[in-house]
Amino acid sequence: MNPDVLSFWRVYLATLGDSHAHRLLTPEAFVFGDSPELADELAALVLAGIKRATASLAVEFSAVGDPLPSTGDVCVVLRGDGQPVAVIERTAVAQVPFGEVDAAFAAREGEGDGSLASWRANHERDFDYAH
């Protein structure tokens, strides 16, 4: 864990009780998006409480040998320059076919205009680009 993330994590832990379960975890740190500019935009949506969900392709994890996300995972969200800005916890994880993603999920993801049509257009492009 890089020193900035470690320091951020320690500040977060200091806000918790001594027996809080997060004290036993080592968080993953990551950026949302595929460019520094998009990472900054999405981190700002997280901080504003607008972005409360995300979507990924399962193959993106298996291709690099990473496990799929799990409920209860705690993560540090980074800006595009790698600076930590938020601690998030995965409260639910589901594998859903692209065509079955619903409007409620699209709204929780908080990107674009928040509509399902916008979500599908953006993610179809992003997922095609990834593969």
State where each predicted segment sits.
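Mixed-charge, low-complexity intrinsically disordered regions
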Residues: 1-87, 93-131
